[in-house]
């Protein structure tokens, strides 16, 4: 059996610290681009699990690239989003990988923001030329009716996360998610093992399918451990207007505060920590908090935030594969794919 390659093995080969290698592989912290590139190349060369199936060198991949599968009059890959995606969003790393993987198509990637009016009226962004569009990838498109309109375009389509799909007809498109259940349940188990009994959830579970799955994973876990008291102190205000204020007002009304919170994402977690501090509670001394995404901010927020890491590079590679194969074979059955996530323990849970 082949020996499993570890982060320490890569560090030894490059004579770098394990922490430096971990930052490059998990896309956290600040590193020089040359150092990050050197580490990722060595990881691929050594067969590290996260990079073993990626091209070792982009130059080699470009040299051997096949002719474009796209017709000459349809060379645009359109990215649609209903909100601004900043560098803290997991899509930042993912899109870098996605774009590098579709380079051989000789296509251009265009980005289109869906306005509130376009969302309401179920119209495409005015900047999008659908006649020249070979495929569409969607981020933060969580309006179900709008998503259905996109499915009716008869254009190869990939959703990265979706509206909440329970009790609704499935979208006629490929769907890509990060794994939302396993590590949330591991986080709850970790809290229980460390003596936490009243564990609650924070975040709008109906915001998107991933938030819903994270909530259901949390709920299943506390029910499994027989610790359902925390269900009564979940902080789940809905909507995006003044969310930090809504969250603060929600937890301010609690007569009994939980021992710990599992949050829908890191930004909910950070808003929650600030609200708890305003109410006189300390994290982690009084209450533990776990986020999701492992955003750049998680590692330097005070306290350093326990989170669940999304592998953006792997999601980017998978997204490119899903969309390219859909373009090549439009009649394929629709696919739903989940990519691995990992629990990262830090200060906000006493680690």
Predicted regions and their residues:
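N-terminal helix-turn-helix DNA-binding module of bacterial transcription factors
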Residues: 1-65
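Short, solvent-exposed amphipathic alpha-helices that sit
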Residues: 89-105, 183-186, 209-229, 271, ...
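An alpha-beta-alpha
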Residues: 185-227, 335-350
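Amphipathic helical "hinge" segments at domain boundaries
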Residues: 2, 48-124
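Hydrophobic alpha-helical segments within soluble ligand-binding/sensing domains
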Residues: 174-202, 241-249, 269, 310-328
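Flexible loop/hinge segments that line or gate small-molecule binding clefts
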Residues: 139-183, 267, 293-305
């Amino acid at each position: 059996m082949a020996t499993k390659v570890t982060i320490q093995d890569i560090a030894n080969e490059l004579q770098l610290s394990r922490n430096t290698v971990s930052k490059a592989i998990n896309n956290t912290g600040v590193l020089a681009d040359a150092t990050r590139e050197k580490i990722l190349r060595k990881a691929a060369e050594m067969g590290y699990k996260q990079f073993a199936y990626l091209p070792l060198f982009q130059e080699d991949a470009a040299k051997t690239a096949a002719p474009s599968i796209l017709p000459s009059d349809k060379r645009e890959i359109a990215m649609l989003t209903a909100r601004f995606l900043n560098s803290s969003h997991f899509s930042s790393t993912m899109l870098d990988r996605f774009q590098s993987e579709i380079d051989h198509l000789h296509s251009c990637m265009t980005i289109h923001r869906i306005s509130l009016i376009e969302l309401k009226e179920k119209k495409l962004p005015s900047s999008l030329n659908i006649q020249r569009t070979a495929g569409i990838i969607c981020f933060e498109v969580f309006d179900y009716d709008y998503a259905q309109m996109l499915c009716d375009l008869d254009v190869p389509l990939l959703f990265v996360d979706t509206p909440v799909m329970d009790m609704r007809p499935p979208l006629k498109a490929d769907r890509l998610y990060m794994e939302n259940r396993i590590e949330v349940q591991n986080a709850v188990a970790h809290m229980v093992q460390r003596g936490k009994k009243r564990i609650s959830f924070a975040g709008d579970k109906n915001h998107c399918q991933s938030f819903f799955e994270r909530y259901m994973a949390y709920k299943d876990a506390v029910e499994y451990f027989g610790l359902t008291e925390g269900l009564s102190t979940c902080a789940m205000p809905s909507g995006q207007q003044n969310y930090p204020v809504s969250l603060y007002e929600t937890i301010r009304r609690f007569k009994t505060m939980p021992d710990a919170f599992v949050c829908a994402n890191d930004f909910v977690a950070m808003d929650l920590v600030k609200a708890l501090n305003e109410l006189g509670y300390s994290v982690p001394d009084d209450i533990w908090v776990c986020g999701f995404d492992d955003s750049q901010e998680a590692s330097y927020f005070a306290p350093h935030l326990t989170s669940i890491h999304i592998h953006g590079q792997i999601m980017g590679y998978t997204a490119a594969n899903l969309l390219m194969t859909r373009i090549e074979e439009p009649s394929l059955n629709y696919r739903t794919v989940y990519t691995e996530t990992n629990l990262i323990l830090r200060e906000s849970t006493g680690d």
